[in-house]
Amino acid sequence: LGEVASFATELAEARLYENIIGRSAGFWEYLFPRMQQLCPSLAVGERETLFQSVNQVRPTLIRNNADELTYILHILIRYEVEKDLIRGTLSVAELPQVWRQKYTDYLGITPRNDREGVLQDIQWAAGYMGYFPGYLTSNLMAAQFAAALERELGPLRHLLAAGRFR
């Protein structure tokens, strides 16, 4: 009691708010007029521009900056690398080159250095091997949470646009 059931459950809640709610048209319908109150120079037509901006699909080097679609490819790269490390078919010395090649193959972009590449996450340094598939599981759970909310309360777009967050 008072604790989350798992890491994936905790992250699913975060992904629900970040991706399903925060990137939704209904949320931006609610938020934009409030943004205009704080920044009157925002034109009415800019709501759509902001909405499109937060939903733009564009490969990035850093997983935490990835859009909803390419985020999954970041997880797949990490899963494949971890699997090969654990199996012993990939050495630590080979990691940077394999990482760069997978980014080139999967995302069409290449890290310029290890900071943008294999060293960008703290999970391995903290001893969390096999951790990254939990991020994918959490995305699936967030989608299930959203579906359950809609079954119970109606379309999320309408609820969010009306500011019904409780």
Segments predicted by a language model, with ranges:
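C-terminal, non-catalytic "cap/extension" segments appended to globular domains
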Residues: 75, 79-166
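A conserved active-site cap/scaffold subdomain adjacent to cofactor or substrate pockets
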Residues: 2-90
